[in-house]
Amino acid sequence: VSGGLHGVGASVVNALSEWLEVTIYREGREYKQRYERGHTMYPLKEIGTCAPDQAGTTVTFLPDKEIFEETVYDYDILKQRLREMAFLTKGLKIVLRDTREDSKKENTFHYEGGIREFVSYLNKSKEALYPEIIYCEGEKDGVAVEVAMQHNDSYTENSYGFVNNINTPEGGTHIVGFRNALTKTFNDYARKNKLLKDNEPNLSGDDIREGLTAIVSVKIEEPQFEGQTKQKLGNSEARGAVDFVVSRQLE
């Protein structure tokens, strides 16, 4: 599943579709515009009225079979991505509805707990080591930071990074900042409370993150990704912002 970066998502979908229609409901009026293979069929025009409180936009399109060999949508891929988006934007309600005759189904995603519920969902088949999901939120240098985490009885770390709701499978500076903050804060606490003797080495980051499930979500105005597929974040300010927010709130 791809995500936008330069504001060209709708233009790309339009160019790759046999046709695309946009219907807008605003201030009691309904407007429409249609495109075919990227070309405007008619300018935006008013086509009727709607309820005064109805507002929003409907975008309908048909993938171009001359471009794509396969035009059948995979419901499960869409379901996973839309669930992610609902977790990452607390309070947002997303309805996924399949109206194809041979596969009719529907799912609704709505999570008031946001990424806390995301961690709970990821840990549902595991035994949590403590009941509370640790949550940190803040902003620094124009970077909004949200982090939720909880350890479980497994031996594997599962830390997932998101930038403007886009998954970064290879991590990046936001994940580096999170791990730095976690390692430093745990070791400072252990030293201060005499859990580590003066002659003992610090706890390693790998040991601290064993069995950890975490979501690290940042919102940043000008994200810099390594590669077009957005696998990894490169903004240095994201590292500092996540480190600052997590360190301060864990202390």
Segments predicted by a language model, with ranges:
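Flexible beta-alpha connector loops of hexameric P-loop NTPases
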Residues: 68, 167-170, 234, 238
